[in-house]
């Protein structure tokens, strides 16, 4: 029996990097609404008094980018020049060119070396799922997102009118083997107006945010709670720190539990496998866990630019699988179509849905198509039949008696945590 800690963080929508993600995805949505086949790679930088939008966009649509930028900043909550950054007075600069024809020919059917629509770039993408929460996400990132969203809700409802848009949260969970047993530390840092006292902030965050978001049974006298541990957080947002699109990729995914291939999501249309293949890898991994074939599952997909079929698929069930990983890999490759065009069609990715993804995580939210578990029953039916379950595995030790190809499934204590969804 091993006890260990794991920590994940989240940020609010007013964090400067998240401001950029939301601007990039708001521009993407504005274009896709008028031209679903557009090619978009849109990056944003924000700093005091300015926002810069740059990238490569090929489209028949016209979008008033400065208006989209300002409306997004306004929606987030930067409405007062006293914060050092606001939607009315900030300058908006744009530097946009068309997509490179050398890239376009690999993504456009019939133009490259291969007939099919190929991947928009080479790269490796990961998807992950675990049964420790109802949304099949790791507990630390689920609770961190929940805290961050609660900060924004209380600010926007004006229940805590001294809150400002920038903020960060962090949760450390103590595990026994693979089961979360307690919260060992919580950190909440929130931007605030200058007149509010530190004790007022601490008391409100404890009672209205932490105690509302984290189950009491996971907290104890030894749980460490830190609220604005520097004692003051007035200067924040783009006034305090420069922001860039794509700098919160761990917040966007699994909080560090489950690997990341390095590609960011926001501002990219779904021909970019950095985005669409990560969504699909999550879809596959979540269906595996929902089918009870494994308690944890990580799926890696890798592509070559301009080529439709992935060059590699890898499945890891971390010793929790009920069938061998080689059996699972073979089944996934035969039954889940991972070509970029097929992913886009299966997950319905040409709609303007992306602004919503750009804060509080891309995964663990039922509103998105890649969170469906519509393949779980079929997976269980096909792979838990005795004839298939008996197939010897070779992935993590050939010829194991239980046919799992991995370590014996650990006993998981207690009921799994639920209600961690942001």
UniProtKB/Swiss-Prot annotation:
Residues noted as binding K(+) in the record, renumbered to the chain: 43
Annotated metabolic or biological route of this protein: Amino-acid biosynthesis; S-adenosyl-L-methionine biosynthesis; S-adenosyl-L-methionine from L-methionine: step 1/1
Names of the cofactor(s): Mg(2+); K(+)
Cellular component, GO annotation: cytoplasm
Cofactor note: Binds 2 divalent ions per subunit. Binds 1 potassium ion per subunit.
Pfam name, any one: S-AdoMet_synt_N
Keyword Ribosomal protein belongs to the record: no
InterPro entries assigned: ADOMET_SYNTHASE_CS, S-AdoMet_synt_C, S-AdoMet_synt_central, S-AdoMet_synt_N, S-AdoMet_synthetase, S-AdoMet_synthetase_sfam
Binding-site positions, L-methionine: 56, 99, 241, 272
Residues the record lists as binding Mg(2+): 17
Source taxon at top rank: Bacteria
Region spans: Flexible loop: 99-109
Molecular function GO terms recorded: ATP binding; magnesium ion binding; methionine adenosyltransferase activity
Keyword terms of this UniProt record: ATP-binding, Cytoplasm, Magnesium, Metal-binding, Nucleotide-binding, One-carbon metabolism, Potassium, Transferase
Entry EC no(s): 2.5.1.6
Catalyzed chemical reaction(s): L-methionine + ATP + H2O = S-adenosyl-L-methionine + phosphate + diphosphate
Cellular localization per UniProt: Cytoplasm
Annotated residues for binding of ATP: 15, 166-168, 232-233, 241, 247-248, 264, 268
Region annotated Disordered, chain positions: 390-422
Enzyme class: transferase
Entry similarity comment: Belongs to the AdoMet synthase family.
Record's function text: Catalyzes the formation of S-adenosylmethionine (AdoMet) from methionine and ATP. The overall synthetic reaction is composed of two sequential steps, AdoMet formation and the subsequent tripolyphosphate hydrolysis which occurs prior to release of AdoMet from the enzyme.
Assembly with partners or alone: Homotetramer; dimer of dimers.
PANTHER family given in the database record: S-ADENOSYLMETHIONINE SYNTHETASE
Name of the protein in question: S-adenosylmethionine synthase
Gene: metK
């Amino acid at each position: 029996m091993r006890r260990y800690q794991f920590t994940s963080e989240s940020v609010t929508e007013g964090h400067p990097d998240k401001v950029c993600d939301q601007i990039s995805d708001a521009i993407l949505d504005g274009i896709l609404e008028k031209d679903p086949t557009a090619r978009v790679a849109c990056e944003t930088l924000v700093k005091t008094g300015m926002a810069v939008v740059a990238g490569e966009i090929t489209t028949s649509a016209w979008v008033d980018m400065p208006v989209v930028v300002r409306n997004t900043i306004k929606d987030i909550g930067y409405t007062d020049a006293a914060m050092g950054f606001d939607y009315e007075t900030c300058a908006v600069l744009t530097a946009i060119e068309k997509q490179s024809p050398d890239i376009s020919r690999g993504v456009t059917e019939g133009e490259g070396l291969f007939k099919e629509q190929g991947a928009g770039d080479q790269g490796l993408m990961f998807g992950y799922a675990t049964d420790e929460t109802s949304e099949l996400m790791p507990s630390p990132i689920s609770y961190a997102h929940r805290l961050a969203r609660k900060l924004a809700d209380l600010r926007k409802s004006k229940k805590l009118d001294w809150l400002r848009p920038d903020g960060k949260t962090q949760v450390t969970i103590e595990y026994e083997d693979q089961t979360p047993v307690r919260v060992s530390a919580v950190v909440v840092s929130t931007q605030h107006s200058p007149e509010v006292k530190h004790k007022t902030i601490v008391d409100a965050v404890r009672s209205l945010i932490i105690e509302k978001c984290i189950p009491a049974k996971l907290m104890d006298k030894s749980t460490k709670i830190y609220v604005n541990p520097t004692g003051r957080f007035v200067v924040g947002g783009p006034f305090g720190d420069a922001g860039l699109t794509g700098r919160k990729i761990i917040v966007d995914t699994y909080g560090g539990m489950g690997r990341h291939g390095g590609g960011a999501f926001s501002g990219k249309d779904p021909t970019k496998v950095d985005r669409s293949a990560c969504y699909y890898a999550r879809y596959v991994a979540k269906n595996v866990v929902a089918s009870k074939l494994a308690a944890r599952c990580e799926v890696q997909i890798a592509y070559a630019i301009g080529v439709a079929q992935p060059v590699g698929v890898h499945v890891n069930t971390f010793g929790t699988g009920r069938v061998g990983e080689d059996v699972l890999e073979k089944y996934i490759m035969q039954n889940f179509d991972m070509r970029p065009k097929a992913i886009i069609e299966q997950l319905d990715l040409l709609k303007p849905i992306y602004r919503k993804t750009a804060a509080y995580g891309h995964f663990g939210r039922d509103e998105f198509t890649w969170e469906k578990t519509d393949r779980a029953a079929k997976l269980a039916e096909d792979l838990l039949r005795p004839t298939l379950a008996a197939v010897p595995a070779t992935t993590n030790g050939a010829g194991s008696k239980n046919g799992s190809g991995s370590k014996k499934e650990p006993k998981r204590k207690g009921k799994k945590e639920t209600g961690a969804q942001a």
